[in-house]
UniProtKB/Swiss-Prot annotation:
<dbReference type="InterPro" id="IPR015899">
    <property type="entry name" value="UDP-GalPyranose_mutase_C"/>
</dbReference>
<keyword id="KW-0274">FAD</keyword>
<feature type="binding site">
    <location>
        <position position="345"/>
    </location>
    <ligand>
        <name>UDP-alpha-D-galactose</name>
    </ligand>
</feature>
<feature type="binding site">
    <location>
        <begin position="71"/>
        <end position="72"/>
    </location>
    <ligand>
        <name>FAD</name>
    </ligand>
</feature>
<comment type="function">
    <text>Involved in the conversion of UDP-GalP into UDP-GalF through a 2-keto intermediate.</text>
</comment>
<feature type="binding site">
    <location>
        <position position="25"/>
    </location>
    <ligand>
        <name>FAD</name>
    </ligand>
</feature>
<feature type="binding site">
    <location>
        <position position="380"/>
    </location>
    <ligand>
        <name>UDP-alpha-D-galactose</name>
    </ligand>
</feature>
<feature type="binding site">
    <location>
        <position position="297"/>
    </location>
    <ligand>
        <name>UDP-alpha-D-galactose</name>
    </ligand>
</feature>
<protein>
    <recommendedName>
        <fullName>UDP-galactopyranose mutase</fullName>
        <ecNumber>5.4.99.9</ecNumber>
    </recommendedName>
</protein>
<keyword id="KW-0413">Isomerase</keyword>
<dbReference type="GO" id="GO:0005829">
    <property type="term" value="C:cytosol"/>
</dbReference>
<dbReference type="InterPro" id="IPR004379">
    <property type="entry name" value="UDP-GALP_mutase"/>
</dbReference>
<feature type="binding site">
    <location>
        <position position="306"/>
    </location>
    <ligand>
        <name>UDP-alpha-D-galactose</name>
    </ligand>
</feature>
<feature type="binding site">
    <location>
        <position position="200"/>
    </location>
    <ligand>
        <name>UDP-alpha-D-galactose</name>
    </ligand>
</feature>
<comment type="similarity">
    <text>Belongs to the UDP-galactopyranose/dTDP-fucopyranose mutase family.</text>
</comment>
<dbReference type="GO" id="GO:0050660">
    <property type="term" value="F:flavin adenine dinucleotide binding"/>
</dbReference>
<feature type="binding site">
    <location>
        <position position="374"/>
    </location>
    <ligand>
        <name>FAD</name>
    </ligand>
</feature>
């Protein structure tokens, strides 16, 4: 691993592939290419690898935490499971999310029959559960959008609670716009469980976090003689001029896999794609455990969306009398803004998707560039899907 700047000390022309971005997508792709005998120059603008999955030990408490917010691995994809097996020894963590509301109820997400019994009086809860069992016997889940269409008073009572107290205010903060302006599909993806199964990832075959952390696992992936990893690389190493890909201002015909911001690649010629970002306030407490659940959602707080206690996720340092917690506040991504300087969630509304399509058309006109990852594809991508896409891209490039 080399920390000096590129390109002063490297002959990029000797590599079979150049990969820009050492997040989960770029790392997985580079590893697979190297395993098939291809040399890879892997470039990263940050001074660490792992993208937003990066984790490290806190200097004050000595506890492992995720610098860019919590990442819980989960998948039912066998190819993905086979790939991670040599690198991820998952702990036994099962994801749990608590709700901090304006009452003392101990509620968790996703909503299931047990949560309905806590929230509603006995008669209403029993009527609601019986209704679901009679009318949806084969369904495991219903979406919030489906609940909205059911003309039954207890269902509407549940729907209104979830919309007004839980998912509505959370979404307003998350996306920075009034509820009526948020794409209905956002709330439509929210599901309740029609059983006692409160699993946050009910379809996952495996879930958890890698013992020792993601950074340790990713470092192992890139520890290959055919991978040359360079950190602290300027983001503008790759540029485009008249449909010609330039690398360090020199024309290049080698295959380049680009995992960065697609609008930045083209100099923001059509304007900037919008993202939501997050600001983290870090707190340390001299206690073994600070909160009841690893993640506490705060839908009714004016600014904060959630609070995360990392030792409950990592299952490391549980006996320590110290703990580290992050409070997340969402905001609009603005380059150079110290609070919201990282692009996290693409704002996939009609106008931004149309803008992305224009940039994608430009990229498709360049034969030797390949887009990969959430920033290049302007998509929110779970970790297992990012790995699956990288495996598929590697297979395509090796043909």
């Amino acid at each position: 691993m080399t920390l000096f700047s590129f390109p002063n000390y490297v002959n990029w022309n000797k590599f079979d592939f150049i990969v820009l971005g050492a997040g989960i997508s770029g790392i997985v792709l580079s590893h697979v290419l190297a395993q098939h005998g291809k040399s890879v120059l892997l470039l990263e603008k940050r001074n660490q690898l792992g993208g937003n999955c990066y984790d490290k030990l806190d200097e004050t408490t000595g506890l492992l935490f995720h610098q860019y917010g919590p990442h819980i691995f989960h998948t039912d994809n066998q190819k993905v499971m086979d790939f991670i097996q040599p690198f991820f020894e998952l702990n036994n963590y099962q994801h749990r999310v608590g709700l901090q509301l304006d009452n003392n109820l101990d509620l968790t997400l996703p909503f299931d029959f047990s949560q309905m019994r806590k929230l509603l009086d006995t008669k209403t809860a029993s009527s609601l559960i019986n209704f679901f069992q009679q009318h949806f016997p084969a369904e495991k889940h219903l979406t919030l959008m489906q609940l909205q269409t059911i003309n039954f008073a207890p269902v509407q009572q549940l729907y209104q609670f979830l919309k007004i107290k839980v998912y509505g205010p959370y979404s307003v903060k998350m996306w920075g716009m009034p509820l009526e302006q948020i794409d209905p599909s956002v709330l439509g993806r929210v599901k309740i469980s029609l059983s006692e199964n409160s699993s946050y990832f009910p379809t996952a075959t495996i879930q958890g976090l890698p013992k020792g952390g993601y950074t340790k696992a990713f470092t192992k992936m890139v520890d290959h003689p055919l991978i040359d990893l360079r950190l602290n690389c300027p983001a503008n190493l790759i540029s485009v001029n008249n449909n010609q890909l330039l690398f360090a201002n020199q024309p290049i015909t080698k295959p380049v896999v680009y995992c960065g911001l697609i609008d930045q690649l083209f100099g923001y010629c059509f304007g900037r794609l919008q993202y939501r970002s997050l600001h983290f306030e870090w707190k340390r407490y001299a206690v073994k455990q600070h909160q009841a659940y690893p993640v506490m959602n705060w839908p009714l707080h004016p600014t904060i969306t959630r609070q995360v206690e990392y030792k409950q996720l990592t299952q490391e340092g549980l006996e320590s009398n110290q703990t580290i917690v992050s409070c997340e506040t969402p905001g609009a991504f603005r380059e150079g803004d110290p609070r919201f300087m990282e692009p996290y969630y693409p704002l996939n509304d009609v106008s931004n998707n149309a803008l992305f399509a224009r940039y994608l058309k430009l990229a498709n006109a360049i034969p030797n560039i390949h887009l990969l990852g959430r920033l290049a594809l302007y998509q929110y991508i779970d970790m297992d899907r990012a790995i699956a896409q990288s495996l598929a891209k590697a297979e395509q490039l090796l043909q």
